[in-house]
Design a protein with these regions (language model features):
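Acidic, Mg2+-coordinating active-site environments of NTP-dependent enzymes
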Residues: 53-186, 210-211, 234-242, 251-268
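Buried hydrophobic packing segments
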Residues: 13-17, 145-155, 201, 205
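Phosphate-binding loop of NTP-binding sites
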Residues: 1-90, 95-99
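AMP-binding/adenylate-forming catalytic core of the ANL superfamily
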Residues: 71, 193-255
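Conserved strand-to-helix beginnings and helix N-cap segments that scaffold or border functional pockets
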Residues: 14, 40, 65-68, 145, ...
Length: 277
């Protein structure tokens, strides 16, 4: 049983449980979201985790958290409530060194290869390895699946069972979802993109041949980092064939970054709405 489609609030978790026939399930997987310190602690009171996952840390929601240290503190609330062990992404593991629960640095993935039609990688547990492929795009997808694999292994699934499940994972709507239409590849990454997600999406875009066009309103909810991160985003777009910026305020630092990195002014435009773009 899982919480559906980013239903990561107290009401969302409660609805998932109340609407299910619990006797049909052995495991409940709950997504926990936060915009303020204390939000995850509240969710853990409702649903205390046996095994928890921290998939990463970035500046998303700094507008409401205020500081990066508050983001780390909020994520750490799940570790304070974890009964068995926590699986933590390698690139942020050290941020949680002071928490007492058993912590596992996600290290079961290796030899990641990225293609237009998916991602191949190796999963290894207790000296046994399996080569797997997912239709999900980008190296970050391999690392996200590895986190899930660590959790699955922790609750008793075998490596073969995990490996067989990887190809069955489907696209998540609006999260780097590949849509083929009339000979055109569309990467729909429209859901609440953060800094890491935007960088990953651009790397995936580079895997494809042909003209590369990006439509973006910029990155939101970054607080004091909003100007800097949107400027950096603009620099990363400078080598593309065309860029369409949507909106008014956030797109200005994106355009400045684009120009700073040598982007062609004839290949970028600003439109007021997504429909106009």
């Amino acid at each position: 049983l899982t919480t559906p489609r980013s239903h990561n609030t107290p009401i969302g978790i409660a609805l998932a449980v109340n609407n299910a026939q619990l006797e049909d399930y052995d495991v409940f997987i709950a997504e926990m979201g936060a915009r303020h310190v204390g939000d995850i602690a509240e969710l853990c009171e409702i649903c205390p985790p046996d095994v928890s996952l921290i998939t990463g840390i970035c500046g998303q929601h700094l507008e409401t958290f205020g500081t990066f240290s508050n983001v780390v503190k909020a994520k750490g609330e799940i570790l304070e409530a974890t009964k068995d062990r926590a699986v933590i992404a390698d690139d942020c593991f050290d941020l949680f060194a002071d928490y007492a629960c058993e912590k596992v640095r996600c290290g079961c993935v290796s030899d990641v290869e990225c293609f237009e039609d998916g991602t191949q990688f190796t999963l290894t547990f207790d000296g046994q390895s399996r080569r797997v492929k997912t239709k999900l795009l980008g190296a970050h997808s391999a690392y996200n699946i590895a986190l899930a694999a660590e959790a699955a292994y922790a609750v008793g699934m075998g490596l073969d069972e995990i490996a067989e499940a990887v190809p069955e994972i489907g696209y998540i709507e609006h999260r780097l979802q590949l849509i083929k239409s009339g000979g055109v590849n569309i990467l729909d990454d429209g859901y609440n993109s953060n800094v890491k997600g935007a960088r990953a999406a651009i790397e995936v875009l580079k895997l494809f041949g042909g003209r590369k066009i990006v439509v973006t309103p910029g990155l939101v909810e970054l607080g004091v980092l909003e100007e800097e991160e949107n400027f950096t985003l603009g620099k990363s777009l400078a080598g593309l064939d065309f860029v369409i910026l949507v909106g008014e305020t956030l797109v200005l630092p994106v355009k400045r970054g684009y120009a700073e990195d040598g982007g062609d002014e004839q290949k970028i435009m600003i439109k007021p709405t997504l429909a106009a773009a």
